[in-house]
Amino acid sequence: MKVFIILGALNAMMAVGTGAFGAHGLENKLSAKYLSVWEKATTYQMYHGLGLLAIGIISGTTSINVNWVGWLLFFGIVFFSGSLYILALTQIRIIGAITPIGGVLFIVGWLMLVIGTFKI
């Protein structure tokens, strides 16, 4: 599905930008702890952005419906990486409670891909 290629490319692009911003713009503004949080958000955004690209590419070539997988990965990025970016910038710790929602969305998305693959 074209939408997942677009979302994947945009997320990979944003991960490069947020990674550079973290390394150069936040270096002396955040503690090592919160820089690490920022880096984790960037890393997971990149991994799952690449996952979205893969979902977009395989969606037209397989008999399994991968649309749910794509949406779960996308919203996983929003909740997981998004909450970590906000946490790093604001240092409001309660925001970290949102992060596991994104993690669960990632896990369920990948699991659905595995299950769908076995059904082929």
UniProtKB/Swiss-Prot annotation:
Source species: Staphylococcus saprophyticus subsp. saprophyticus (strain ATCC 15305 / DSM 20229 / NCIMB 8711 / NCTC 7292 / S-41)
Family that this chain belongs to: Belongs to the UPF0382 family.
Listed transmembrane segments: 3-23, 46-66, 69-89, 94-114
Ranges in coiled-coil conformation: none
Domain of life: Bacteria
Lipid bilayer topology: Multi-pass membrane protein
Keyword Transmembrane: yes
Record-given protein name: UPF0382 membrane protein SSP2132
Cited InterPro entries: DUF423
Keywords: Cell membrane, Membrane, Transmembrane, Transmembrane helix
A GO cellular-component term linked to this record: plasma membrane
Pfam families, per database record: DUF423
Keyword Magnesium: no
Primary subcellular site in the record, as a coarse category: membrane
Subcellular location: Cell membrane
